């Protein structure tokens, strides 16, 4: 999506140069906003459907056995017996089963867990996948657009994404280690430690790019890079089951989006009421407000 948008903009610039006329940047040169949103929705559907329907995307749930010699009465949706793993932690044997569910991490509550199925009546819990995919679409679209809006100053989106990646990488590593997950009382997700390798590469790529993208920037990522950064961060958050922590992780993205929303809404409201639009910030997104004040 971002690549096609950037390509169309560069193509319009090249055509203007070939005609010998001054190029004036315009939003109409790239993809229309509705096409960008459509592409992000399609991406959200793919990510959500993969996470929900792929049998390898599971979490480990601890089960208690009163009798070590008795068979463990755990069954899946089809009534088949589920295998369990036994792990010795601090000299005590613990038993875990792989569970396919839509449980995620929710901050600042005692259990640290939340099941999306609880948002629906019991009679409609079989349609949880629809609700889950809608949530994925919303978050993927919001985060990718947030990263895109943040990419307005040299090194801003790249630096913020690197910091977010470090936080997600730590969560991925501890969530994939059964002993650390048990000690920290967080959700254990098997094989998630391998994801930390990808996240390390992601952070390294951001830092490497930042070397050339820091002020004064020599290289720009455009929509190709910023939309990709947001999409990767959103997908990683869902894989780690930490998507409800995104307002904390992606606080800068959130503030940037809110600044644009407030600016546009307030301008339209005051123009309709007083005949002349007023602004909250000197310019939005927020980083341009501080740039106008000379803080850059």
Regions found by a protein language model. Name each.
Residues 99-117:
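N-terminal TM1-TM2 helical hairpin plus the immediately adjacent luminal interfacial "cap"
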Residues 1-3, 7, 12-15, 34-104, ...:
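Alpha-helical transmembrane segments
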Residues 110, 114, 121-122, 266, ...:
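Generic secondary-structure transition motif, activating predominantly at the C-termini of alpha-helices
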Residues 28-31, 111-128, 186-196:
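Short aromatic-rich membrane-water interface segments that cap or initiate transmembrane helices
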Residues 17, 45, 113-115:
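A broad, structure-centric signal for solvent-exposed, well-ordered loop/edge residues
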Residues 17-35:
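Juxtamembrane helix-capping/reentrant segments at transmembrane boundaries
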